Every structure is written in structure tokens, then in C-alpha cells.
UniProtKB/Swiss-Prot annotation:
Catalytic activity: a phenol + 3'-phosphoadenylyl sulfate = an aryl sulfate + adenosine 3',5'-bisphosphate + H(+); 3,3',5-triiodo-L-thyronine + 3'-phosphoadenylyl sulfate = 3,3',5-triiodo-L-thyronine sulfate + adenosine 3',5'-bisphosphate + H(+); 3,3',5'-triiodo-L-thyronine + 3'-phosphoadenylyl sulfate = 3,3',5'-triiodo-L-thyronine sulfate + adenosine 3',5'-bisphosphate + H(+); 3,3'-diiodo-L-thyronine + 3'-phosphoadenylyl sulfate = 3,3'-diiodo-L-thyronine sulfate + adenosine 3',5'-bisphosphate + H(+)
Catalytic residues identified in the record: 109 (proton acceptor)
Compartmental location: Cytoplasm
An individual GO BP term: ethanol catabolic process
Tissue specificity: Liver specific.
Keyword Disulfide bond: no
Gene responsible for this protein: Sult1b1
Chief location bin: cytoplasm
Protein name as annotated: Sulfotransferase 1B1
Positions annotated to bind substrate: 107-109
GO molecular function, one term: aryl sulfotransferase activity
Cellular component GO terms, alphabetical: cytosol
This protein's UniProt keywords: Cytoplasm, Transferase
Amino acid sequence: MSASEDVWRKDLKMIHGYPMIYAFALNWERIEEFQSTPGDIVITTYPKSGTTWLSEIVDMVLNDGNVEKCKRDVITSKVPMLELSVPGIRISGVELLKKTPSPRIIKTHLPIDLLPKSFWENKCKMIYLARNGKDVAVSYYHFDLMNSINPLPGTWEEYLEKFLAGNVAYGSWFDHVKSWWEKREEHPLLYLYYEELKQNPKKEIKKIASFLDKTLDEEALDRIVHHTSFEMMKENPLVNYTHLPTAMMDHSKSPFMRKGIVGDWKNYFTMTQTEQFDAVYKKKMSGTTLEFCTDIQSA
């Protein structure tokens, strides 16, 4: 049996109180000991919140909207995922980052408590993209159907129960979005919403450029908006994850880029499930100024 065969569909493994993908949890010291540099740019999200979208936008901003430069490699190489480790299948994120020249763009889904201390010490710029929890739950469910390094999700009903309890990889969505929101008061952190990026991409991309000290003309902004639209990215083999082996991600079960819309949750949530989610939301999010849009029309 190859080293890669024993990580598929394994139960999550607890790391300092957080459920983590089994393959990623092996040799966790590599994460704790990771050394950042002050020029590192960290893209941080809860899973299925537009991470790849934001990664391509940031890469384009740093390259002044030059589409050809952004075609230099696949997204998983341009923007390595810090915690990624699938023995025998992929070079680990940490190993890839050692070879990546500065300024590095680093992707992670880690909760604040698990992020290597060196990112805080170096005051690395971070961009957090938050997406409403109902759409995240639906997207995460479909992702777990096709992503073999995650446990099988079971039925939608079973999965939603796990999601609401935080018994999914990276833990509670509620805790994740809330703790990163609070962190922006003490760290150079730009906090963005998926729904706002969807509704007014140029405005949000301007915020990203400003945060990264980049000045872009209107033509460059328009190129970025066009190149990073869902329709373009879904068909772009450099960013749609079709470059990964089918053993790891089976797009016949569900494409990595499925719909990319706001409000798809309405096609899955029953009235009872909506009430259940809203009750948990009210309890977990009390006292925070965070506000989420669950329907683009209401934005």
C-alpha cells in the first residue's frame, strides 16, 4: 500500500481542540514551527467561502492585472495552502512555501488559535473573506462528497447537524468568522464579505489593492473583475482544481466550483432547518457586530 492510500475518508483528528483533516493533522509540528516573513500575505477563510476566488484576485492585484503573468502556474502552486499535506500525492504546503519567493501569498483555513505565532509576530498582512453560514454549509456538504481527504458527509440532514455543532474540519463556522472579525482591531487585517465581493467586485478589489499598497488604473481593475468572474474561473483549468488527481477530488461527484451564488441554501434548507440554524446563529453570534447577507436581493 502506498503512503497516499491510508489518508482517504479518515475521521477528523483533534488538534488543540479543533477537528482537523486527518492527513493535515499528521506531523503538526511543521505548522507550529512555520516561520513567516514580514512580506507574507495571508489569505484566510473558513472553508468554502471563496478562498480560491480571493487568491486569484490577490495574485492579479500584485501583478497589476496582468492576465498572462497570472497564467504562470496553477493556483495551488501560486498560492500554497499552509496546512496542506497529502503524503505521496502532493508536496506539502510548508515544503512548497520554502521554495516560494517573497512576497508569498499563503492560503489557510486555520482558526486563529492554530495559526503559527510567527504570522502575528511579523505583523503579516491578512485578508479574511467571510461568507454567510447557510451557503457555506451547503457548499461544504457538496465539497465533502467529492474531496476524499475529508470524511464522507452522510446525508444533508446529518451533515447540517455536524456543521451546526462544529463537528466538521476546522470546527465551528460561527467561532471562526467571529474570532477573525475581532482580530482586525489589533492586527493588519482586511475583513471582506463574499456577498459584497459578488455584488460589487470592483469596489471590493479596490479595497484589496489599497490594503496591499497597490495603485491600479480602471483598465487593470476591469481585467481583474473579468478574469476572476465565476464563469471565467469555472472554465479555467489553472484555478478550478481539475489538475488534482481524481483520487483526491472527484469532480464527477460534485465540481469544485459548483455554483458560486448567494442564496443557494434555499434549495436545500427546510423551514425547520432554517429555524434551527437561526436559533444557533442567534445564540453563538450574540454580542458581535458582524452582519451577514443571505440573499443578494436584500443586500
